[in-house]
Amino acid sequence: MKLQKPKGTQDILPGDAAKWQYVESVARDTFSQYNYGEIRTPMFEHYEVISRSVGDTTDIVTKEMYDFYDKGDRHITLRPEGTAPVVRSYVENKLFAPEVQKPVKLYYIGSMFRYERPQAGRLREFHQIGVECFGAANPATDVETIAMAYHLFEKLGIKDVTLHLNSLGSPESRAAYRQALIDYLTPMRDQLSKDSQRRLDENPLRVLDSKEKEDKLAVEKAPSILDYLDEESQAHFEAVKDMLEALNIPYVIDTNMVRGLDYYNHTIFEFITSVEGSDLTICAGGRYDSLVGYFGGPETPGFGFGLGLERLLMVIEKQGITLPIETEMDVYLAVLGDGANSKALELVQAIRRQGFTAERDYLGRKIKAQFKSADTFKAKLVMTLGESEVEAGKAVIKNNRSRQEVEVSFEDMMTNFANISEQLLS
């Protein structure tokens, strides 16, 4: 049997990993500017953490969960999304306590797992960056969080991003709209896809989210949830729109957007961009004011978003964005003969300890092959070290581009490589 990675997973090799690290670094820096701290939760949770919060009737729970019973007969699932585990942690670790500064702002970066058909930008193991803010019902929190995602896209150079916005209102507003939608869709039930016929019974708002052609036709003239918002929900949504306009963040109202998770209320949003003529959601989130209470904590407002790293990197590639990744090496040591082996290790280690990137030959290759490696690594400086150099206690270091060179003692290399580098590269 040929051993291969499981379907829907990928190996992220060093050349690509550098791009991932850059995007993650920009995200961390951006979130830090907004006073967010990192949280790390387990990759697997008790099944009920996900099923009861995300919703028993959602596609995630009914079709996509990687769940199993462990050796203690506990029902476990690999996490399919990030919000529920973070809320569980918020409650379990009593981050709602009075001594904890509010709002509590958390971000996470990690793997999620969903059993779905692999396609471009969507895998069974995928990586998500997400944020959650607890403790503020102020609509300014909604806008700040949306603005933070927008800020991140600006930093990464992503173009043609459109903010899609909607409100699900309060639970009362949502219940009134739910009934109106049932009344509208029931007469055309037979025209819906089989999935949406099931959704009509279990969670009719999800019919609006369907990608099936017949469902899209059916909901074209469906009532708008915005017509069912109560006074408080309307005021919240108007405040969100006003503040987005004050920050010069353009948006479009999308009344058919409901999000695939059951815990949202009031503001929901997606950032959508165009890739090769197709619309692609690169970030989505919203407000969830009941979820902390659902997990046994005090009633606490929450707002957050998630974005898929694979999809974000695909957009970066398709838009031709060049990430400023440092690929050059500071110095390469070409090693000639067994007599130079030990000293080469000593020198390369001393250079690294001074903060420089360095590599040496370990394979005993001919000098031409070693110089080719130096070029492949884009080494700025190259040093040749043989037995005669070891005996003399010094060696020649050259600029790999200008060919300028200087003879330097081992003592200087081991204690003052910064001056040597500056002399040759200035």
UniProtKB/Swiss-Prot annotation:
Cellular component GO terms held in the UniProt record: cytoplasm
Localisation per UniProt entry: Cytoplasm
Main enzyme class: ligase
Top-rank taxon, per record: Bacteria
InterPro entries: aa-tRNA-synth_II (IPR006195), aa-tRNA-synth_II/BPL/LPL (IPR045864), Anticodon-bd (IPR004154), Anticodon-bd_dom_sf (IPR036621), His-tRNA-ligase (IPR015807), HisRS-like_core (IPR041715), HisRS/HisZ (IPR004516), HisRS_anticodon (IPR033656)
Keyword Protein biosynthesis: yes
GO molecular function, one term: transferase activity
EC number: 6.1.1.21
UniProtKB keywords: Aminoacyl-tRNA synthetase, ATP-binding, Cytoplasm, Ligase, Nucleotide-binding, Protein biosynthesis
GO biological process: histidyl-tRNA aminoacylation
Catalytic activity: tRNA(His) + L-histidine + ATP = L-histidyl-tRNA(His) + AMP + diphosphate + H(+)
Keyword Glycoprotein: no
Family classification: Belongs to the class-II aminoacyl-tRNA synthetase family.
Subunit text: Homodimer.
Protein name per its UniProtKB record: Histidine--tRNA ligase
Native source species: Streptococcus pyogenes serotype M18 (strain MGAS8232)
